[in-house]
From Swiss-Prot:
Similarity comment text for this entry: Belongs to the short-chain dehydrogenases/reductases (SDR) family.
Annotated GO CC locations: mitochondrion; peroxisome
Principal cellular location given in the protein's record: other
GO terms for MF: oxidoreductase activity
InterPro entries: HSDL2 (IPR051935), NAD(P)-bd_dom_sf (IPR036291), SCP2_sterol-bd_dom (IPR003033), SCP2_sterol-bd_dom_sf (IPR036527), SDR_fam (IPR002347)
EC supergroup of this enzyme: oxidoreductase
Active site: 168
E.C. number: 1.-.-.-
Name used for this protein in its record: Hydroxysteroid dehydrogenase-like protein 2
Subcellular location: Peroxisome; Mitochondrion
A Pfam entry, by short name: SCP2
Keywords from the UniProt entry: Mitochondrion, NADP, Oxidoreductase, Peroxisome
Amino acid sequence: MLQNTGKLAGCTIFITGASRGIGKAIALKAAQDGANVVIAAKTADPHPKLPGTIYTAAAEIEAAGGKALPCIVDVRDEKQINDAVEQAVEKFGGIDILVNNASAINLTGTLQTPMKKADLMLGINLRGTYLTSKLCIPHLLKSKNPHILNLSPPLNLNPIWFKNHTAYTIAKYGMSMCVLGMAEEFRGSIAVNALWPKTAIQTAAMDMLGGSEVGKQCRKVEIMADAAYAIFKQPTSFTGQFVIDEDILKKEGIKDFDVYAVEPGHPLLPDFFLDGQPEDLVKHMEAHGATPAFTTAKADPVAAGPVSEMFNTIRGIISPEMVKTTQGVYKFNLAGEHAGVWYLDLKNDAGSAGNGEPPVKADVVMSMDSEDFVKMFGGKLKPTMAFMSGKLTIKGDMGLAIKLEKMMAMMKSKL
């Protein structure tokens, strides 16, 4: 691994999304030099499924030798960012490095992506990066060797990286375009670069996309922390670069990359937006025991009807609370004009819903006409009446079927 040199001693680093994952790893690497770290993230209270808060991260940073300032920040909120910037300047005297790490991901096609999810990704990835940079730049300009580092991919305009998740790609490439523009705008004053991993990195987001078995195909977050550290050592003339973690570490003399592997010797999963094919990523994940929570298949015509619209709405209102209280996976075999198979997973991770077979075995299988399905989820047909009249057949856990009926009543006001 890359050794610390003390280069960042006394520097102030403002990191968004630093309560866990890659953001926290970068913070801890800098802390070993004695850096000041502003932890700008949303998680103030413990999350039921995700590790860490801004306060636990602060404690780890202090223990590693740095100084920490935990700030509750949603990067979509200009006031919260501005307050955090002001607190950082007041406590540490300025800002030397900004890391735009906060990000949201949803790998669904255009018809399957509710605007709520699209707005979330654009708001956090693109707008959040632009806004945080804008508010930090006046202070960065006063630093001796200022850097902005966006955790975003090279601008690979091959359509294969758009076709299955256009909204996510636009949002993520927006971060990369901030690099392209700001690097030129502030050339000679601030180094503005992007960093992206060559392979998948084990994070909560990766576990969500590939399931628990995907971890062994990943590298640890420390490789990204070391790569970021290598970038921060560069002068401001090193700017406008789209850096791949492994490439810059090779230039730093690192030869043994097995130390970064979650399971040394296991085949590694290439990351998105590089030279591979999306279909190959899915095959790689499946071949080594992971369960991809996304698809590379072309959009199905069935995804353009009223059933699809209903599922778009359902996706937009799935919440951790629903998953926690329901704990069931539902499969819907629909006949009629909009025939097809759909699923609703209110058991695993953050919950999911979509066209096709469920990612895991269904606890309940419901069969009915597509028109009746739309009526039922739209509140115009009671599930009990549909079942009693023979319009709905149910196989599996009846208790979970009843839970779904209760949930539909709660959903009715939101549909």
